Design a protein with these regions (language model features):
Chain A
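Alpha4 helix (beta4-alpha4-beta5 surface) of REC/receiver domains from two-component response regulators
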Residues: 68, 89-104, 114-117
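Receiver (REC) domain active-site loop signature in two-component systems and cognate sites
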Residues: 61
């Protein structure tokens, strides 16, 4: 199972890799990282075969936002699950995410137990 | 001579005149024969200042005033004479003479007067005495006038001085009020920008705190795991992770600390000392604070942020909270401008705000550039004026750039300038001497 994590904070990579250490080690999960929406778009475009099952994206990023990425992903790869992450869990953001086709919305700080469930329920 | 006045009467009058007191009878007669008389109604001018002086006058009846404009030098009545001075020196009349009441004068013209003088030089003494009297009288009048003017002038000076002192204390009061208002406005502006920042700050603190929490929690779990493990390679791996995590915790803790410090710095009343500051670090932090502040108030907002920091930028002695306000203000403006342009909805527009630092001629330069709406040429002169704002009412205080300008040019002896092309870009350049 392959997941793409998109966040402008570089340290999320080390954090996620440790949080999912066991799963990664056991070969149950593979993680890729992109540090901007534009990066994520090129990662997705270069992937063949498209074996990614989930994109986990921060909303508030410099340049293109998580919403831009969500729109782009849903248009180009409608089968991909996109879960949005934000420090702001207000109704506006949540409604917007779901209307653009997000399959979930997580508020920071991330509850990793919940995230794990979400990933493995796919 | 005039018909209305008898010859004998005229002789009588002339005899009474001081000038002709000791003139022999035949000369008085001779003079009387050549004399003409003239009548003047009250208010009529007998002599005008500046006239040619070709006769002198003896008052037969009535009263006249000798004056220069409104300035009356003397009033004289019958038996007195006037106009002899111009006759003697041939200069134009130096005073005017006007009848105060119905007046009859005897006119002695120049030739007749000089004939008498030739025939009887003794009257020269009378003339001199008379002239001296006139001059003394005139002198006294002038001195009195001068004294009264001097007094008037002194009184006026005293009055004006008092008025000025009053005005001065009024102005001092106004100035005090202004200073107070200014302080309040500055405080208001600080609070306004702080309010705008709050969301950005919350976000900027929350992010590192999340990392601190996550990495410390992970480390605890790693420690538990470490206790169970026996394999040395695995244990070494965990130790490396632990070390990394502790470094992350430390970094993010410092990051949060620095943000809180900046925030406190920003709102605190200024302390009097300049401190050495790393302007790269400050620019970076406030760029992100401004970004998150904008985003929190405006969920659609986003822009690219580019930083080009000079590697060996010297530290500069600055009032750091003041400089942070300038930076924040410039970043906020830049982001406001790119957002405004983005809202025009032109395809392919990529909002971008960049900050570049460099050292030029012993000055540190901070350039804040945006590709927003731009500033029209006609507004460039006004943007640094207090209360000038293009934002809708209630959104801007109009003080941001004017305060920034004062901070850079006055407290730091630097320069703040702007370059802009409408629809293309705006660049503010801060220049601070090292």
């Amino acid at each position: 199972m392959k997941v793409l994590i998109v966040d402008d904070e570089l340290d999320v990579e080390q954090l996620y890799r440790q949080r999912f250490r066991k799963e990664i080690k056991a070969g149950e999960l593979e993680m890729m990282f992109a540090f901007s929406a534009t990066d994520a778009m090129s990662v997705l475009a270069e992937l063949a075969p498209m074996d990614i099952v989930l994109v986990l994206s921060d909303i508030n990023m410099p340049g293109l936002t998580g919403f831009d990425l969500l729109k782009f992903t849903k248009e180009k790869y409608p089968h991909l699950n996109v879960v949005m992450v934000s420090a702001y869990g207000d109704a506006d953001n949540m409604n917007r995410a779901s209307s653009l086709g997000a399959s979930g919305f997580l508020v920071k700080p991330i509850d990793f137990t919940l995230l794990k469930e979400k990933i493995f329920s796919i | 001579m005039s018909n209305s006045i008898s010859f004998d009467f005229l002789i009588k009058v002339l005899r009474k005149v001081f000038l002709f007191q000791n003139l022999p009878d035949h000369l008085v007669k001779q003079l009387s024969e050549s004399i003409t008389t003239q009548e003047f109604e009250a208010g009529k001018a007998i002599i005008e200042k500046g006239d040619e002086g070709n006769a002198m006058f003896v008052i037969i009846s009535g009263k006249v005033k000798i004056h220069d404009g409104n300035e009356v030098v003397a009033e004289i009545n019958e038996g007195n004479f006037f106009g002899e001075m111009a006759l003697l020196d041939g200069e134009p009349r130096s005073m005017s003479v006007t009848a105060i009441e119905h007046t009859v004068v005897a006119i002695i013209n120049r030739n007749d007067f000089f004939n008498v003088l030739n025939d009887f030089p003794a009257i020269s003494k009378n003339i001199i005495t008379q002239l001296t009297r006139h001059l003394r009288a005139q002198n006294d009048v002038l001195i009195a006038q001068w004294r009264s003017r001097e007094k008037e002038l002194n009184d006026l000076v005293e009055k004006r001085t008092e008025e000025l002192a009053n005005k001065n204390s009024e102005l001092m009061l106004v100035l005090d009020n202004l200073k107070l208002s200014q302080q309040q406005l500055v405080q208001q502006e600080k609070l306004a920008s702080l309010g705008q920042l709050t969301a950005g700050i919350a976000h900027e603190i929350k992010n590192p705190l999340n990392f601190v929490n996550n990495f410390s929690q992970l480390s605890l779990e790693l420690l538990e795991e470490f206790k169970e493990l026996t394999d040395e390679t695995e244990r070494a791996e965990i130790l490396t992770d632990l070390k990394n995590n502790l470094e992350k915790i430390n970094n993010h803790g410092k990051r949060a600390d620095s943000i809180v410090k900046n925030m406190l710095n920003h709102s605190r009343t200024r302390n009097d000392d300049k401190q050495l500051a790393d302007l790269n670090k400050m620019s970076d932090e406030f760029l992100h604070l401004a970004y998150h502040g904008m985003f929190a108030n405006n969920p659609d907002f986003s822009c690219y942020m580019k930083t080009n920091f000079a590697e060996k930028l010297p530290k500069v002695n600055v009032f750091s909270q003041d400089i942070s306000r300038v930076l924040l203000n410039l970043f906020n403006n830049a982001m406001y401008a790119v957002n405004k342009r983005k809202k025009l909805g032109v395809m392919g527009y990529e909002p971008s705000v960049s900050v570049t630092t460099s050292t030029v001629n012993n000055c540190v330069l901070i350039e804040v550039e945006d590709n927003g709406t731009g500033i029209p040429e006609t507004m460039k002169d006004k943007i640094f004026e207090p209360f000038f704002t293009t934002k809708p009412s209630g959104e801007g205080t109009g003080l941001g750039l004017s305060l920034s300008y004062d901070i850079i040019t006055q407290s730091h002896k630097g320069k703040l300038s702007v370059e802009s092309v409408v629809g293309q870009y705006t660049k503010f350049i801060i220049q601070i001497p090292v």
